[in-house]
Amino acid sequence: MVRNWCSLIRPRRIEIDESTHTRFYGEFVCQPLERGFGITLGNALRRVLLSSIQGAAIVSVKIDNVLHEFSTVPGVKEDITDIILNLKGVRLKLLSDGPRVIRIDTKKEGVITAADIITDGTVEVLNEDHYIASLSGDMPFRMEMVVNSGRGYVQAKKEKDVDQPEGTINIDALYSPIKKVNYTVTHARVGQIADYDKLSLEVWTDGNVLPEDAVAFAAKILKKQLQVFVGLHTVIGTEEVEEEEEGEAVSEKENLNDILLRHVEDLELSVRSANCLKNAGINLIGELVQKSEAEMLKTKNFGRKSLSEIKEILAEYGLTFGMKLEFTPWNKDVREEMGEIQEEG
């Protein structure tokens, strides 16, 4: 049984659009992918991002002299249901384990915003200009809120906990720090083949988590969930395992040969690094990996930045500089086969 995933092309790196990247937005481009994998990965990442990234939210509130959500507060423009609705829009970052208590204690006339929230230093308010309520007079207004961490959307508890003080109102919690996720799939080219996928993923957050961290967390969640399926091959018989291991060894060797025979342009290096390799006469990946780092640094215009770039990309293929190879994929016969050298007339 041959391990059929060996020959699938894998994306080399993730590109981030630095011109539009902020704490709240990021666009990530992943290529090349096998045809169909753009939608497969894009949809999976989108669903996990929207449902499973941990955030913080207000889960309950207690307002002085208020016993239930249908009450009103003298001197406050909004009724309690409106205040609760506004509290759901307060975006918070929990800097330690929850739950934590935050509060508002004011008697100034005018607008109350999230900036008026008093914390103990373990909770950060992300949208301080968010509107909560308005006071029409110099009336004292005191409110305590409990903040906790969680995932997704959780409905308010219908029954109060025994340790909750009288007048506590549980509210629905929108924990997710992800506001929106879009993805598009277009064609990508590798060498002369343009039948691959390019996945572009856009992520909007509330600032609780950086977009790139959110994508990384989503990928780790998917990896953990899929890990159990990887072990399914252990249930087959001993004889099949031996055959599979032998097949895997052959497959891995063939796969390595394929990589070494590919042109260095397939690595999609920066223009500077690509020109350095071209000027040094390094055309195939097999030629590149046999060079030592010291040799590469002696190449004209080739610096440590280019070295780091190439090392990172080679590592994704399980390759490195200074490899000792049992064959020479850069000989004349192979180059003729690859179209590198034209036959002499």
Curated annotation (Swiss-Prot):
Gene Ontology, cellular component aspect: cytoplasm; DNA-directed RNA polymerase complex
Reaction catalysis annotation: RNA(n) + a ribonucleoside 5'-triphosphate = RNA(n+1) + diphosphate
Superkingdom to which the source organism belongs: Bacteria
Classification via Pfam families: RNA_pol_A_bac (PF01000), RNA_pol_A_CTD (PF03118), RNA_pol_L (PF01193)
Cleavable signal peptide: none
InterPro entries in the record: DNA-dir_RNA_pol_insert, DNA-dir_RNA_pol_RpoA/D/Rpb3, DNA-dir_RpoA, RBP11-like, RNAP_asu_C, RNApol_insert_sf
Keywords, comma-separated and alphabetical: DNA-directed RNA polymerase, Nucleotidyltransferase, Transcription, Transferase
Domain free text: The N-terminal domain is essential for RNAP assembly and basal transcription, whereas the C-terminal domain is involved in interaction with transcriptional regulators and with upstream promoter elements.
HAMAP family: RNApol_bact_RpoA (MF_00059)
Record note on quaternary structure: Homodimer. The RNAP catalytic core consists of 2 alpha, 1 beta, 1 beta' and 1 omega subunit. When a sigma factor is associated with the core the holoenzyme is formed, which can initiate transcription.
Protein family: Belongs to the RNA polymerase alpha chain family.
Protein name: DNA-directed RNA polymerase subunit alpha
